[in-house]
């Protein structure tokens, strides 16, 4: 048996909204004399045995009117099975049945199953063979019915069905047909709604995890936060797969099954689905029903979906264990509680994550706009909503429906409300998970939502444990319920879930924040302060000082907070974020913190009850000590960074629970109280306490202290001997303690110490006891300029993995250094007195990195070859180092060898034995003349840097470097010829031959199939690019600047991937190849200072070209529309520049109707005598503001603005040849309290043959399209502002020009300039109101080009539209114009005498 397509019932795509009452499952249509007593009879019996109610017409009584009964039977059947046999079409009754069946398929969703019984389906479809013969007999008497019959046959034959041949037993064929029909009739497609965005990837992933090909029982869990789409995914999978199973069931809303009656109903539904509707109403016990379910499932292959499970008991009575299920069964469980899935021991877990931005935007748009994308006016608002929803489908649907068909102001109002009040439909769904928590977990959740979101998990556990909460269990429960996530061990929470937590806190007293249990918003804090009864109920408070709108000077603000557990008063700038930065950066952050802290002004009478306080953070705490009534008995952590504390507290405090004290950058702290009252302290941070002179000897009593940070304590000179008693200390930081001179002898007793940081101190030596630090892993002594000798016993530190001696006064290392068997990193760079590496250094078998750069070392001992683990060796800038040791080739794991700027002359042949070496740097080795022949054996080498060496050629073996990706030979003045076999380097991606004596390249260069970058600039003898160079299909950049090249071969057009081609300063280059236009990927073309006179028309075919640099303005008629920047600052011809600007402007006008980037086009040109007349500059200096024309946003003839400035390079580099200046151009539109800002950064290269003092002014012009400004905000803006900034140039003057579509004909008449009113005049005004430039008394003068474009456009039939000084448009038709200028516009602009098509 062969199926014509899939085993899938065919029905109409549109089903009736009202369900039909059906009497039969199947209506059998067949030709009686063909199959009544054989195939059809057997099929009818088989269908009956499967419980499929089947109608066949031979059950009718003889003589009864058959037609109406048939019609009714078909209508009352869910489906039809059509047996197409040899003589089927010879029966008009059969054909009429068929017509009715196909009508029901279209109108009622009637399923149709065709069977082609020993007939060719194509004969049925095309009415050929016996079907054609039958229709030939109908032509005379039944012409009116023939079209309907033919259509019905064709449609039925096109459906999926079965083609029965004589190649199999008929009984087997009937069994398969019956089973397939049974499955398809039993399939109940679940309603999944419309707008299923992003569902496909979830369904695909889940089907993979179900392993349908396996005969094992498999259970997969889907979990995620409420509203994320778990049920929808499960329904789609059910619809997709249920027909593949004989028995299936989808049980929804199981979380409600905690109620026995609901559980009873669910059990009955499951039994009914499996037993085909029979159920088990006579069994009342839930337990007995569970036993019955087990017995029934065990013998069947089932597909079951259990949706929204939240308790194990629900699974116990519905599914039990996997042992209940028959072979090949599949179960999907959806839940918010991951723990349920873990206990059920599902085979796989699938977490549903939120939609990505594009998917979220599409889903929201389908509900808000009834289309896939947001309307242009609503794009920014849509982004705000999508950002708010963070990929949650429920929220996107609810808010999309809410905002549908509302105006922009209404959107803004709704979004403002969302900040303080979530939508009820979203809140209700999310809150279900919270409602299922016990009292303690609810408290933990609210603490996380209102205080701890974004904090590290270990920190949160520590504080919550201090609150006497079972923190580990609570956080695990919340994670299982998807109320939080723990990426990178951090407490994270969806913003909508956090907002749900806030709403729970507010719900009893929505407008009385003084009664809330938690405060997190500064605005709510300020409102709470106004309450007469004070703030009594608060347990946690997080206060961002930077957001306080007014100064709080109430010293009693905390007086009634008797329940306060967690208090965080913090600055927007965290001083810890500046750690490691410069002193200036730290000072800047410190100033911000202190400025924020000044908003809380407390008097000496300040008090607050701290009996319940577990966590206190107060950045910039203003008083010199904590209040007298401060208790701290339950305090776990105390953070008073950047405070005014001089002494923490007075008298004795019982601080048994205290684990962390952080007083960093408390600059007035001169001493710490004795430490005996805090025996459990684990971390003490006093970094930046610049007044701290010493550490109290009682520090040794803190047996649990693991971290002590004293960085940048500038007055600290030593540590007490009791420091050695810190038996748990792991990290000790003393870096930047500039007066710290001596490490205590007893410091060696700290047996747990793993990290000791003494960077940038005044220490001179270390005691011998340092060798007793048996756990020490990292020792930092860099920039200790007085440190001269490493102790002999230092070799006893068997755990040491990193030793940093950079920039110390050390001269040598003791032989015991070889005993550091765990050492992996040794840094001796910048030790100017270090001359000799010890022979026994080769014993450091674990050493991976050895940095000796910029030392006085002359050679290395042969034992260096014994460093079998060494991967990195740097000797750069060792000016006395002359010879690499022969045995160095034994370092089989060496990856990187840096010998740059040494006195080395050659390398030993053993260098070829470095089989793992990837990077070899020899740049600036001025005596290095010859690369070894055996160097080609380094099969792993990926980068070889020979820049600025004395090398003349390369050996043929260079071609054997099969892994080489980068070869740098730049500035090798003696290098003349690239080897022919160099073409064998199939992995080479970058070849740098800049400033060499090379004359040509071999043809084999075309074999470098991976080459992406080829640099030949400043090769003054290089004359010809090889014809076969066009074979380098991967080439992205070809730099030929300042060579002797005259032309390029036509094959250059074959460089299909080339993006950058630079030929600047090629003084002999005269002709750009016609086929150059084939380089479809070219983005940047540099032709400055060439001898080229014109460009071929094919230049317009460079469809990706964005940057074009020119000199002498060669003639060309077209520019690519993709062009974004043109640099013509060396052009001197006024006429050529005019033509260039005209082409730019024309291109920009064309592009305003197409897709574009925000900054569509920019040009850099000289300010020659004619250019200032074309561009109106409204202001001296670097910034200008103008009023926008009335109705600028609605005007279809207004495409955008031109921003422009005149500048001059400001640096005085007399020897400079090429100078790069960076521009920052900022555009601002503002008005009515709204602002739009856009910034463009652009880089322009200047060939400077003279001092900058003698250079001429240059002009920068930006064309900016209106459509880059969000349309929904157009009506808000009244003014436009432009500013230009650059560190390398001085901005002299600038302007904004409003463009309106101008003359589209061959020329444009000149107009008399309107009287200067300030807005539209071309004169310059300085800050004092003085006018420069134009003479206001002149009656006639040439209007600048951009003024002309600003004030002139064509109306219908050639009428001229003028703007007055207020921006109002006036129409003049057939008015005579002043005959001041007769020269056509195209001559004045240099534009071609052709029509402009926009």
UniProtKB/Swiss-Prot annotation:
Pfam families tied to this protein: C-JID (PF20160), LRR_14 (PF23598), LRR_3 (PF07725), NB-ARC (PF00931), TIR (PF01582), WHD_ROQ1 (PF23282)
Positions of short motif Nuclear localization signal: 1369-1373
Region annotation Disordered: where it falls in the sequence: 1315-1336
Gene Ontology CC: cytoplasm; nucleus
Catalytic activity: NAD(+) + H2O = ADP-D-ribose + nicotinamide + H(+)
Assembly and binders: Homodimer; homodimerization is required for NAD(+) hydrolase (NADase) activity.
Protein name (Swiss-Prot/TrEMBL): Disease resistance protein RPV1
Organism: Vitis rotundifolia
Lineage of source species: Eukaryota, Viridiplantae, Streptophyta, Embryophyta, Tracheophyta
